[in-house]
Amino acid sequence: MSDLRQNFERDGFVVIENVFNDQEIEEIKGAIGKIVEDMNLAEHPKSVFSTYDEDKHAADSYFLNSSDKIRFFFEEGAVDKDGELTVPKDKALNKIGHGLHLLDPTFKKMTFNSKIQKIFQGIGYQEPEVVQSMYIFKQPKIGGAVTDHVDSTFLRVNPIDHLTGVWIAIDEASVENGCLSFIPGSHKDTSTSDYRFVRTHDTTGGPLLKFIGTRPTYDQSKFQHVPISKGSLILIHGLVVHKSEANTSDKSRHAYTIHVMEKQNTEWSKDNWLQETEQYKFPNLYKQ
């Protein structure tokens, strides 16, 4: 077994240094800059993304139907009570998702890259499918904290461990600007797996999304900061507990993330917020 796979299975995450070079990173920054520049604010509701307030979790059709689209989600501190931006739009965004890997050629190139393919071959994935992609801004001064969580709360598969995230640092991620923190080995505990973010399947005008089960609490002293350099990435097991603090620095902490499931002998939950459509099926990482 390779060191990469051994460390990943031991800790639930692994850092892989210098996967993408400066040119590849600058191409991504250029692509996201153009996407933001071309965004017409009038065409997009100012959905605020927060993982702290369960009832504010962008529980609307804009979020629900974003699996094969490029959609925009704003920082809490960037939208006032009247729904107006308090900062320029390029500094107001929390994230863009969830179909960058489908619709933008630069993001598609980074996603279906031979280097990413080799990583998933290295951890034994036979039929990896890319289920979502996000560009996370973590803006200077207002970049919100992401509370402790496991990715399988939001994207549930059976078997539950057939989900892996890839977190690519587009900027250097340091303690000061809100790098990720992990509880090493926490992916081995499935006792809190009843907590989920699901579709309600409501047709009466009620909430479209909700959290079910008991929200787990974690020993904060067990978290370890994992700073990484620009162009490096973190491979993240779907059950490992992680979080990030608010960005109180004057430096951005951009990241591009994808989530990949092992399709072989795996069931994608029909209650997941994110679903395939008649037009869109999750693409195979190895066949693009």
From Swiss-Prot:
Q: Which UniProt keywords apply?
A: Dioxygenase, Iron, Metal-binding, Oxidoreductase
Write out the function statement from the record. Has alpha-ketoglutarate-dependent dioxygenase activity. Does not show detectable activity towards fatty acid CoA thioesters. Is not expected to be active with phytanoyl CoA.
Known Pfam families for this protein? PhyH
Q: What is its EC number?
A: 1.-.-.-
Which cofactors, by name?
Fe cation
Binding sites annotated in the UniProt record for Fe cation? 149, 151, 242
Q: Which residues form a coiled coil?
A: none
Provide the residue positions that the database annotates as binding 2-oxoglutarate: 95, 134, 149-151, 167, 244, 253
**Broadest EC class assigned to this enzyme:** oxidoreductase
Write out the GO MF terms: dioxygenase activity; metal ion binding
Write down what this protein is called: Phytanoyl-CoA dioxygenase domain-containing protein 1 homolog
Q: Which organism is it from?
A: Caenorhabditis briggsae
Q: Which family does it belong to?
A: Belongs to the PhyH family. PHYHD1 subfamily.
Identify the Gene3D superfamilies for this entry.
Answer: q2cbj1_9rhob like domain
